[in-house]
Amino acid sequence: MKFYQDENFENIDFTTRHELAEFDNCSFSNCNFGKMNLTGYNFLECDFTTCDLSLATLTDTSFNQAIFKDCKLLGLRFDACNDFLFAVNFINCQLNFSSFFQRKMKNTNFKDCKLISVDFTEANLENSNFENTTLTDAIFDRTNLSKCNFTTAQNFHIHPEQNQIKAAHFAKDNLSGLLLSYGLKIS
């Protein structure tokens, strides 16, 4: 396995590289990993800015303290990633059609993101932040949302009896997302 530490990668198309690698404290700017097989890759304390990882294979991929900013992350199976020390944060990213099924990811930031049709079934998102995030058709089923911040989140549908929402924060203007399951008409 190739090892990279404290390196900056800019404007690189990684889809043309086929070597298994570990990246420690590296930054990636405007790089392409789209549709790439990242099975077994390790990303430790790495930053991704304006990168495309859409439809990449993430089987046993390690993301430890990874930060994604302005990235395109469509259709990713984060549920297939290595569980050990998994920790990610997202700022202004598109994560549509991705899956976090059964993923343990307390204290995760989803700031200014699009999470359309994302699967959070049975995930532990305790104390996570969904600031200014669009959650149209996102699936919350038996999800731990305790202490999460939804005050500026939009278009979510969370069934209070099927999810843990104790001490979660909601704005009075977006409470309708908690009541849709009951068939109420809110004006």
Tell where the protein language model's regions lie, with residue ranges.
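Tandem repeat scaffolds
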Residues: 1-187
